[in-house]
């Protein structure tokens, strides 16, 4: 039973799928019903994602594997950890969330990733990659210690095997001889950017070797001659590779390697998993799937259909009209190419995010200076440090949330040695549909405490370009943060201008009398809503530009000429940019009431970014409301007068 192409007409009835409310219902089906169910499930995934947006290619590729796992194993007693977690839509549909898929990645809807608080079947949250083997091993050992008899299964794919953490876990797991642990490599040759490196080439050689293919075919012919042996041959299908290629990379880690097998063939998947279920010790199953499986358009262009917005499945994704505003990612990509044209020492580095970070054009034009290191953020940062020691100008393009994974390297390998590495930090602040796991809420706080760091936050497209240029001129590690999505509509200037180090600018001055003068000290994306609040309240607004070094002179000047100060940032308040202003204020000896506005001390869920910012009080109306209630209301006047008398 193998996957078939979807004939999408929008009228699929889902007769079988409607009967599945949990995996127990699935396990009651006859084996012959599973492929029709897979066809319905694949069509349902396509129909759902086309209406909400989300990850499509990888989910179309996990349909049969998901069905087989829940059919063979006793979930949720047996644990499944999905890695990367965006390949779990079929899993969510089969585990009681079919009728919630219309809310996928929407405000107050279900998450696009596994979430423990959402379902008992979501055993571990996995939105960042390469964590599944560690988590599943912990579950397997924990079950042993608790005396529980259950399997722990890590499904790892989408480039996640390129990360060192996966191999650290395998190294540990390989000596756990009694652990009921299964690692499934979902080999679909698909990370967000194509997988890279020696490991990927090794896997490709294993799968495409003519000797293995010919030998396997010969073994199967021999075994199938005698009918009594035929069933044995089928049961031992997963061991065929071991008969001709005995020592694999994974066996060296202490795993029993099985495969590769067709991840879209239920007649191969189910008996293989049933056999594995009877084994003890760490098992490694190599499953080959196809991204976009069953939907011709996604099969032809899996990158385009990796994470689409809403579209008509019958027509496919249509080219969007050129937007009026550039995205910050586009601004970065254009800047990097311009700098590389001017200076042959400029080198671009990405940890498997070529498209997402805007480096497609750079790779085309400067291939010898482009390095995609795979999902290896720690290596990316230290690699950049090494390049810097040789007089090159490395630029690390990285999402804020993924820079967290390389914090020690940022401190020990780059900042401690004061190496001139530029960090272009994309997706800073809230990121919308991807939610808390991908929010760039912490970069200002965790970088600000590191000696030798310079940190800038861009308020518009041209400022982003000029900040990146300024960063490239610095003799020390420098970060420029900018948000996901479109800018404010400001045109970028081709000519480069270096921004004075540690200097902000006043964008608006108040005309209020003494006692009513408010100064808003805004950072990055919060400059625009702060200007809106400033217009409403007639407040001074400063674009602070630098988080480190903070413009202490401007902080003091605003404190001396205003009655109240407000700091606004799209990041966590604790330890962030506002804290830098308060520290500078304390150093100045000028005492003024201060409000620090930013992201609250909680994880912000997925949803429309504008709605989420408003919920956090970080739109123009919310900023004005906070200022009015704290400083400008009659009650605030009474409280202020009482403090002055005291």
Curated annotation (Swiss-Prot):
Swiss-Prot/TrEMBL GO biological process terms: 1-deoxy-D-xylulose 5-phosphate biosynthetic process; isopentenyl diphosphate biosynthetic process, methylerythritol 4-phosphate pathway; terpenoid biosynthetic process; thiamine biosynthetic process
Cofactor binding: number and manner: Binds 1 Mg(2+) ion per subunit.
GO CC, one annotated term: cytosol
Database matches in CDD domains: TPP_DXS (cd02007), TPP_PYR_DXS_TK_like (cd07033)
Residues that bind thiamine diphosphate: 86, 127-129, 159-160, 188, 295, 377
InterPro entries assigned to the protein according to its UniProt record, in alphabetical order: Dxylulose-5-P_synthase, THDP-binding, Transketo_C/PFOR_II, Transketolase-like_Pyr-bd, Transketolase_BS, Transketolase_C, Transketolase_CS
Required cofactor(s): Mg(2+); thiamine diphosphate
Enzymatic reactions: D-glyceraldehyde 3-phosphate + pyruvate + H(+) = 1-deoxy-D-xylulose 5-phosphate + CO2
Record-listed E.C. numbers: 2.2.1.7
Keywords: Isoprene biosynthesis, Magnesium, Metal-binding, Thiamine biosynthesis, Thiamine pyrophosphate, Transferase
GO molecular function: 1-deoxy-D-xylulose-5-phosphate synthase activity; magnesium ion binding; thiamine pyrophosphate binding
PROSITE patterns: TRANSKETOLASE_1 (PS00801), TRANSKETOLASE_2 (PS00802)
Pfam family, any one: Transket_pyr
Annotated residues for binding of Mg(2+): 158, 188
Similarity comment: family membership: Belongs to the transketolase family. DXPS subfamily.
Function, as annotated: Catalyzes the acyloin condensation reaction between C atoms 2 and 3 of pyruvate and glyceraldehyde 3-phosphate to yield 1-deoxy-D-xylulose-5-phosphate (DXP).
Subunit structure: Homodimer.
Protein name as it appears in the record: 1-deoxy-D-xylulose-5-phosphate synthase
Organism annotation: Burkholderia ambifaria (strain ATCC BAA-244 / DSM 16087 / CCUG 44356 / LMG 19182 / AMMD) (Burkholderia cepacia (strain AMMD))
